[in-house]
């Protein structure tokens, strides 16, 4: 029961993002599997958990056309798979399913991945050194690649489980300082956060952006207060500053409100 398209365009799901293309890319016999074990793989299986699926029609939407992708995975040699070709055929199958009275996902109007997530972006802080404040380290299980994750130019997708979103649950949540290596003209600093209330992932209640030339004394550029409201939607919000400043160090702090939980952000973009 993972979202198969942009969460705000879909009924509430358990979480995650599993589009048709990702199902089609699944390899049930990975290269790491030894030859004597390959013969033990007899087929594939997909499960649909229905805690958030109230009707048969909803279940059909979650199954079709993703089950068609899994079927082709099962009977096709990976070397002959072609997603573009499959996608064209899947569009026709969706129409055929509708004609038979089923309720498949509207593949023709698929929104696709989160904007910016398909290719790296460039900005002033990409590749710069990042340090984390005391009691504000990222959670090891959601490191997104480690200390460089927030300045690697990689934008997160629709789910915090895609290994692109860095998670914070330490006492002071998020306190990140970027060393620009030299005094740099800065016109904007911003970061996106996501909220998914079910697994206790919330927006920050306060964000502070500040700068420094010595890395010790910081001047506050902007302080943002945000009232965190629980709802059933997956939401994304940018907290940023725009203006004119010149500094070597940029500090980005974000704290949690009354609900606690995780903070997740994917990139601190500096322009």
What are these regions (language model features)?
Residues 227-233:
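Short proline/glycine- and polar residue-rich coil/turn motifs
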Residues 38-40, 124-126, 144, 154, ...:
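A short, polar/charged loop/turn motif at coil->beta-strand junctions and beta-hairpin connectors
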Residues 14-18, 40, 144-151, 202-208, ...:
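Glycine-rich, flexible loop segments associated with nucleotide phosphate handling
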Residues 103-156, 194-195, 235, 261, ...:
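Mature N-terminal, pre-catalytic/accessory segment of carbohydrate-active enzymes
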Residues 157-222, 233-271:
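Aromatic, loop-rich ligand-recognition surfaces of beta-strand-rich domains
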Residues 4-5, 206, 225-226:
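Short secondary-structure boundary/capping segments
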Residues 136, 215, 224-227:
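Short, solvent-exposed coil/turn elements at secondary-structure transition points
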Residues 1-135, 247:
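Substrate-binding groove of N-acetylhexosamine-processing glycoside hydrolases
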């Amino acid at each position: 029961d993972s979202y198969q398209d942009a969460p705000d365009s879909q009924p509430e799901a358990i979480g995650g993002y599993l589009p048709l293309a990702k199902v089609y890319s699944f390899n049930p016999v990975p290269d790491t599997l030894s030859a004597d074990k390959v013969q033990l793989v007899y087929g594939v299986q997909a499960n649909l958990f229905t805690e958030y699926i109230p009707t048969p029609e909803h279940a059909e939407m979650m199954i079709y056309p993703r089950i068609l992708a899994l079927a082709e995975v099962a009977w096709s040699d990976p070397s002959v798979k072609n997603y573009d070709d499959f996608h064209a055929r899947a569009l026709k199958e969706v129409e055929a399913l509708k004609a038979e009275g089923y309720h498949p996902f509207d593949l023709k109007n698929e929104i696709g991945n989160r904007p910016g997530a398909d290719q790296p972006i460039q900005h002033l802080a990409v590749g710069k050194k990042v340090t984390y404040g005391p009691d504000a380290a990222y959670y090891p299980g959601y490191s997104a690649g480690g200390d460089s994750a927030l300045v690697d130019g990689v934008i997160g997708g629709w789910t915090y489980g895609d290994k692109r979103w860095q998670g914070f649950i330490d006492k002071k949540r998020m306190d990140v300082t970027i060393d620009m290596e030299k005094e740099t003209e800065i016109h904007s600093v911003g970061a996106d956060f996501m909220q998914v209330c079910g697994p206790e992932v919330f927006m920050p209640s306060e964000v502070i952006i500040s700068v420094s030339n010595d890395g010790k004394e910081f001047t506050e550029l902007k302080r943002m207060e945000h009232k965190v409201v629980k709802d059933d939607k997956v939401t994304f919000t940018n907290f940023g500053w725009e203006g004119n400043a010149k500094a070597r160090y940029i500090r980005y702090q974000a704290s949690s409100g009354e609900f606690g939980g995780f903070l997740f952000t994917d990139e601190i973009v500096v322009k």
